[in-house]
């Protein structure tokens, strides 16, 4: 006789096995109508599933944020049905719900184009209107393989073959169409509603491997109501306007090319911006007691085997074989094993702890070409990486110190608010459950001490320890995970790190892995999009441009530019034989924040007319006043 505990703490007893649908109906007709799925002991399930034991149950309705994943998952299935109805012979592969929407990958001779989307969307609306129920079926593995092979669905057959032997093979039907799926789903296609839209097409390799067939991917977005959909579509339009790749070209900051996939060619202005961010982070790290080091790019396989990266991270590493020396080297994907080597070089004392070791380390990680995105997702990058070697008793204080530094950095870059996620043990991982229990408890305790509130991000920790993930929200409401703090008891053990205790014994340090901005490349992409290229003056790669009205003022324009440069400002000069309106237009398109216009009158009076980006108004002031004003505005926040 199952006893079902509801969120309000009340318990309902049932005489025998009971479905979620029956439980909802027993509570009331309103819930029976509103319930879309249920969460049973923390696991999402279809309402049709039968419960035959005591459980904690929560119903998911359209008011719950959890319903979004259900809506998007179901929409992906309906899109796949619509595609196969309209384009017979198309094979389906995988189609998950993702943040903000869903997608499905298809295999066909002709890739889809944006022109195909209206017809697919219309067919989806037909299927949704029919409100066919989602029905879960458990199939025999061999039967499922034979079924999909007979239908020419070789990708589905491959997926089933690769599932663990212990995995239950489940199929979901919606009317006459079916798909391999773990679920859960809502009651029927009608629960999706009409607040969805197909947004774009793209290419993707099967399983992200360029050696596999190229698939045609269709993206869509789905929401609980039209208001949410409209807001999201508006956000997408704004994101397109702010796209860092477009603005990067417009401002001449960087470019990417096929000969160096996933690597950035920084142009003069972009590199100036990069160095400004790096210099700021260097000053902040010095302020908070970090030493800076530099470690090698290529390291012997033996070190990566000892650290655990070879077993847990090799698929993301670039490997190089040295034939003459019979060695296998790897380009470092992260700096942590290298920092342990510096810690181990010589005898360490407890008096040296905490030791805060930082490196703007260049790292390389393999990412499938289809996953790369401008400078925001690359293969070659540098990050504000640091490792704190400390005792267990120092974890809480170091966490408080780190969070304070992080708050200042984010505020200075224009992100005064952030959220925190606690990422716990993943599979696979290094270290025993006992060690993980200890690490997770230490990090939770440190969060309490630091006053950090968090939500749990299950299974997303690093293979060597749990971590905090710090998530920024940008100007148009998008979230970006940048900072991390990870507690690691595993790596010091694996790499035999130790220090001399106060009692002259030996002990292992705890290793705190931390980053604030993370990848400089990605963070600069976020900065570009957050301010749409209109940087605060201290970050602007070109802080001012001097434009002459007439050629007679060219010499004075050069003098003004020289004075501004002497004051430490990044300055451009436009003395072309063009009309001033054309110069102002070109400099505005390049998003130069301050245009100093000079003509014969300004030259005679030693003044300038300043036009701010986006303003038609010009302010006249003496050259000395202009220099003082701009110099003050261009001073980095930590130096004011």
From Swiss-Prot:
It is found in: Cytoplasm. The keyword RNA-binding applies. Belongs to the class-II aminoacyl-tRNA synthetase family. Its main location: cytoplasm. InterPro entries: aa-tRNA-synt_IIb, aa-tRNA-synth_II, aa-tRNA-synth_II/BPL/LPL, Anticodon-bd, Anticodon-bd_dom_sf, Beta-grasp_dom_sf, TGS, TGS-like. Signal peptide: none annotated. One of its GO terms (biological process) is threonyl-tRNA aminoacylation. GO terms for cellular component: cytoplasm. Catalyzes the attachment of threonine to tRNA(Thr) in a two-step reaction: L-threonine is first activated by ATP to form Thr-AMP and then transferred to the acceptor end of tRNA(Thr). Also edits incorrectly charged L-seryl-tRNA(Thr). One of its GO terms (molecular function) is ATP binding. It holds the Pfam family tRNA_SAD. Binds 1 zinc ion per subunit. This is Threonine--tRNA ligase. Zn(2+) binds at residues 336, 387, 513. Its EC number is 6.1.1.3. Residues 243-536 are annotated as: Catalytic. Keywords: Aminoacyl-tRNA synthetase, ATP-binding, Cytoplasm, Ligase, Metal-binding, Nucleotide-binding, Protein biosynthesis, RNA-binding, tRNA-binding, Zinc. Its cofactor is Zn(2+). It catalyses: tRNA(Thr) + L-threonine + ATP = L-threonyl-tRNA(Thr) + AMP + diphosphate + H(+).
């Amino acid at each position: 006789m199952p006893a079902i505990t509801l969120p309000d703490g009340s318990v309902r007893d049932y005489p025998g096995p009971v479905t979620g649908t029956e439980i909802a109906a027993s509570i009331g007709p309103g819930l029976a109508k509103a319930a879309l799925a249920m969460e049973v002991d923390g696991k999402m399930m279809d309402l049709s599933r039968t419960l035959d034991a005591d459980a904690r149950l929560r119903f998911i309705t359209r008011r719950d944020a959890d319903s979004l994943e259900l809506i998007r998952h179901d929409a992906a299935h309906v899109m796949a049905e619509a595609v196969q109805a309209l384009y017979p012979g198309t094979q389906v592969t995988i189609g998950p719900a993702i943040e903000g929407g869903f997608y499905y990958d298809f295999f066909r001779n002709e890739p889809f184009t944006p022109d195909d989307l209206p017809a697919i969307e219309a067919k989806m609306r037909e299927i949704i209107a029919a409100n066919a129920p989602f029905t879960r079926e458990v199939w025999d593995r061999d039967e499922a393989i034979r079924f999909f092979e007979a239908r020419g669905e070789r990708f589905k057959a491959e997926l089933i073959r690769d599932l663990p032997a212990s995995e239950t093979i489940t199929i979901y039907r919606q009317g006459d169409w079916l798909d391999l799926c773990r679920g859960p789903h809502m009651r029927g296609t009608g629960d999706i509603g009409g607040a969805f839209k197909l947004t774009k097409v793209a290419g993707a390799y099967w399983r992200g491997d360029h050696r596999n067939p190229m698939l045609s991917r269709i993206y869509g977005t789905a929401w609980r109501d039209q208001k949410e959909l409209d807001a999201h579509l508006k956000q997408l339009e704004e994101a397109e306007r702010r796209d860092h790749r477009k603005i990067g070209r417009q401002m001449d900051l960087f470019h990417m090319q096929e000969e160096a996939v996933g690597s950035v060619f920084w142009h003069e202005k972009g590199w100036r911006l990069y160095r400004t961010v790096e210099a700021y982070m260097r000053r902040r790290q010095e302020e908070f007691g970090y030493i800076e080091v530099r470690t090698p790019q290529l390291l012997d396989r033996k070190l990566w085997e000892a650290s655990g990266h070879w077993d847990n991270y090799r698929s993301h590493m670039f490997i190089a074989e040295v034939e003459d020396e019979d060695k296998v080297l790897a380009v470092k994907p992260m700096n942590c094993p290298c920092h342990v080597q510096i810690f181990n070089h010589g005898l360490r004392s407890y008096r040296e702890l905490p030791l805060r070791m930082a490196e703007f380390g260049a790292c390389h990680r393999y990412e499938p070409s289809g996953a790369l995105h401008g400078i925001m997702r690359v293969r070659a990058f540098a990050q504000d990486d640091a490792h704190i070697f400390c005792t267990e008793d120092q974890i809480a204080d170091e966490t408080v110190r780190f969070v304070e530094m992080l708050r200042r950095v984010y505020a200075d870059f224009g992100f005064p608010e952030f959220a925190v996620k606690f990422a716990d043990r993943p599979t696979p991982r290094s270290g025993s459950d006992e060690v993980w229990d200890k690490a997770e408890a230490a990090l939770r305790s440190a969060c309490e001490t630091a006053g950090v509130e968090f939500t749990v991000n299950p299974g997303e920790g690093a293979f060597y320890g749990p971590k905090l993930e710090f998530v920024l929200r940008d100007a148009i409401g998008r979230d970006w995970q940048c900072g991390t703090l990870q507690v690691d008891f595993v790596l010091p053990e694996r790499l035999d790190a130790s220090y001399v205790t106060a009692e002259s014994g030996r002990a292992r340090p705890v290793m705190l892995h931390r980053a604030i901005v993370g990848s400089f490349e990605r963070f600069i992409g976020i900065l570009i999009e957050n301010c749409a290229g209109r940087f605060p003056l201290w970050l602007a790669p070109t802080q001012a441009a001097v434009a002459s009205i007439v050629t007679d003022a060219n010499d004075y324009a050069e003098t003004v530019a020289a004075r501004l440069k002497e004051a430490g400002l990044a300055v451009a000069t436009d003395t072309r034989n063009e009309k001033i309106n054309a110069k102002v237009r070109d400099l505005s398109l390049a998003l130069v924040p301050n245009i100093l216009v000079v003509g014969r009158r300004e030259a005679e009076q030693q003044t300038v007319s300043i036009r701010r980006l986006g303003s038609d108004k010009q302010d006249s002031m003496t050259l000395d006043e202009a220099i003082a004003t701009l110099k003050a505005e261009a001073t980095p926040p930590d130096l004011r």
